[in-house]
Regions:
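Alpha/beta enzyme core
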Residues: 1-6, 10, 16-170, 178
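Short glycine/threonine-rich catalytic loop with a Thr-x-Gly-x-Asp
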Residues: 173
């Protein structure tokens, strides 16, 4: 207990710990979960959706998922987008029943996307499919977040806002050192 220290905006845990944090929470901060088979995103869509559903049911305020890189890098953009849309649908259905609004962050894993063009395409794909935030990296790959990737993503957010009026958040994460 450190009353002089500010509270975090959020505490990030694996999906199965959402209920534990919710029960122990004595202050106002968000519970963020990394979900949908984090960090690789390698499983059946049904498994990912069930994990997201359970996390939101148990109190997650924000859900972070990793872009389906296997589909995206193979040029199967619709498969990658549909996965995000399905996650968004599950989040909205479950949170709606609870009278809550739960945010979706899509981690692009920009170090694996490699090119500014891929980073831009993934940014627009995630935003159009329903992401509330786009995030650079899990921190589990190398390279992770880079200033160059951040610039591309922020420029895409600006262009998307100008075209749609919808505000999207940006989260730089993974491999950031000071």
């Amino acid at each position: 207990s450190y009353p002089e220290w500010p509270l975090p905006a959020s505490i990030c845990v694996f999906s199965n710990f959402a209920a534990v944090v919710k029960e122990a929470r004595k202050a106002d901060f968000n519970i963020t979960v990394v979900s949908a088979c984090f960090p690789s995103s390698q499983s059946f869509l049904e498994v990912k959706l069930k994990e997201v559903e359970m996390a939101v049911e148990q109190g997650a305020d924000e859900v972070d998922i990793v872009l389906a890189l296997n589909a995206f890098l193979a040029g199967n953009y619709e498969v990658a987008a549909e996965e995000i849309r399905q996650v968004r649908r599950v989040i909205d259905e479950v949170a709606g029943k609870q009278g809550r609004n739960v945010h979706l962050k899509v981690i692009l894993e920009t170090g694996l996307l490699k090119t500014p063009e891929n980073i831009a395409n993934a940014s627009f794909l995630a935003m159009e499919a329903g992401a509330d935030f786009i995030k650079t990296s899990t921190g589990k790959t190398s390279p992770a977040a880079t200033p160059e990737a951040a610039v591309v993503m922020c420029e895409c957010i600006k262009l998307y806002y100008k075209a749609t009026g919808r505000k999207i958040g940006f989260k730089p994460a993974g491999g950031i050192v000071t």
